[in-house]
Regions:
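Short catalytic-loop micro-motif centered on adjacent basic/acidic residues
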Residues: 47-48
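Non-globular targeting/processing and membrane-anchoring segments
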Residues: 1-17, 21, 25-28, 34-42, ...
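Short hydrophobic beta-strand segments in globular cytosolic domains
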Residues: 80-81
Length: 122
């Protein structure tokens, strides 16, 4: 499977997916930390991919998404945006609605690793 196919499969397989630097327990940049905190505050399970552990995804995703920076949040297969957009949506109360609609029935405040090439997270 090509890296582009892997990315598309990850996006299609996860209702809420965050491509980030590090993981939710140990974000490796302030923007990833902020978005993780905002998602956790919404109380729905989300998947993540640590782009620092997967340089192929890190280099390919901006071409697939037409979005140059990280983190990148996908909800129901659509790119929502990066840190500034997610923060703005949160401040307007819109992020909660998006996350709730996508995450119905999921465990609260949990994250799982969507990158099958890495070991599963807690």
């Amino acid at each position: 499977m090509s890296t582009e196919e892997t990315i598309k499969q990850q996006i299609e397989s996860n209702n809420i997916l965050l491509y980030m630097k590090g993981n939710p327990e140990q974000p490796q940049c302030g923007f990833s930390a902020q978005v993780t905190q905002l998602l956790m505050s919404c109380g729905q399970r989300f998947a993540y991919v640590d782009i620092l552990s997967n340089p192929d995804i890190r280099s390919t995703l901006p071409k697939v998404s037409n979005w140059p920076t990280f983190p990148q949040l996908y909800i129901d297969g659509e790119l929502v945006g990066g840190c500034d957009i997610i923060t703005d949506l949160h401040e307007k109360g819109e992020l909660q609605a998006l996350v709730d609609a996508a995450g119905k029935g999921a465990d609260e405040n949990a994250a799982e690793n969507a990158d099958s090439s890495e070991s599963a997270a807690e």
